[in-house]
Amino acid sequence: MWFFGSKGASGFSSRSTAEEVTHGVDGTGLTAIVTGASSGIGVETARVLSLRGVHVVMAVRNTDSGAKVKEDIVKQVPGAKLDVMELDLSSMQSVRKFASEYKSTGLPLNLLINNAGIMACPFMLSKDNIELQFATNHLGHFLLTKLLLDTMKSTSRESKREGRIVNLSSEAHRFSYPEGVRFDKINDKSSYSSMRAYGQSKLCNVLHANELTKQLKEDGVNITANSLHPGAIMTNLGRYFNPYLAVAVGAVAKYILKSVPQGAATTCYVALNPQVAGVSGEYFQDSNIAKPLPLVKDTELAKKVWDFSTKLTDSQSGESSS
């Protein structure tokens, strides 16, 4: 679909930009957290949300880089409301610190955009001794969402506006390990595959959004949760790629890769476009609903990932699982 740029049911395509899919949308009064907002499509996401009047909190590992991005955005969007806060998703302590500091500001939270990620890195463990891609791409966002969910619920009730949780997944979710999620081998270095581990983390992003949808509906809360594939974009997400592969991809990039404004489009569409009102538990691509791997519709697997993630995050805090 992206290669030909054909429009889907939404009226948008792989060639649509973040500005185009949010044209005419007024986000005044909304507050959003965007993780990984200091690089790649996270920057464009923060910029376009700001352009539409959203107060954006940039959750970034490097606050100096975040401050520079904020400065650049303000130059382009005078009057933009942006804050920079430190967040290292590979560290549960950092996630808890961020959530605590965010709640202490008293800010509402309408939109949570779980954008940050790493891709295809060599085998490494996080500060909590969990395989780094699983820890950063899935577990950090799982914990962040859990800690901020009450704030989102109260914001939705008080503002009478729909809250939206957006998980950036990838088409790589189709290429996880054969067993899908390696619950008993998350830290198995001997059989580690950098790309399959990435796919596993992206599969969990979709399953997380789907289980969230189920729980939010049961609670009767006006909050949606969706996942998406932003498209193939040449950003520093792939900084661990083999250099020869990077050169080969670069040679054909202009024919097959999205620009950053195009890459941020689906995120901004799912976060702001009124067409998505009330839509939850879906997987989007090119600003349209798409079909994910059938495995992600496995509700038992989604619950198992949820329980597994809860156990891992609770074990680092001394809490008991529930």
Curated annotation (Swiss-Prot):
It is found in: Plastid, Chloroplast inner membrane. Keywords: Chloroplast, Membrane, Oxidoreductase, Plastid, Plastid inner membrane, Protein transport, Transport. Its EC number is 1.1.1.-. Disruption phenotype: Embryo lethal. NADP(+) binds at G36, A37, S38, S39, G40, I41, G42, D88, L89, N115, T136. Its main location: plastid. Substrate binds at S170. One of its GO terms (cellular component) is cytosol. It is an enzyme of class 1 (oxidoreductase). Part of the Tic complex. Interacts with TIC110. This is Short-chain dehydrogenase TIC 32, chloroplastic.
